[in-house]
Amino acid sequence: MAVGKRIYLKRKMPDHEVMMQFKEIPASNVADVMERSCAMNPRIRLVSSPKAQMMVGPALTIKARSGDNLALHAAIDMAQEGDVLVVSNEGDNTRALMGEIMMALLYHTKKAAGIILDGPIRDIDEIGKWDFP
C-alpha cells in the first residue's frame, strides 16, 4: 500500500549560533562547498520585496503533489518562528499550492523566516509588497 503523506513530528534542530553564521554567507558559496547538492533551481525567483533578501532558519521540508496542498497546510500548522519552509511541487506549474491567505498565516501568525516554493502561487501582486522572503 502506498503512503500518501508522511509527517515527521520530531525535528532535530540545528545549533542557533552556527545557523546564524550562515546569514552572512552567499548561497552560491554554500552550494559550491556542498558540491552543488543544495543549489536551488534557477527558475525559482524572489516574488516579494523584503528589505533583506537573505533568510536563514531550520528547514521544514514539504513534498506536495500538483494541486494538493494538504501537506503544506500540515506544515504551516507545524511551523515555528524562524522556520524556512521548502516546498517541492515537483516543478509543476499548472496549479498554485498557496496564495495570500496561507502566506499571511505563515508570515504574520507563525513568523516564519521565509518560504521557497518550486511552483506557482496566487495573489502575487499583494504578496510582492510584503517584507517576507
Predicted stretch roles:
Residues 2-133:
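Feature captures the catalytic cores and cofactor-binding loops of soluble hydro-lyases/lyases
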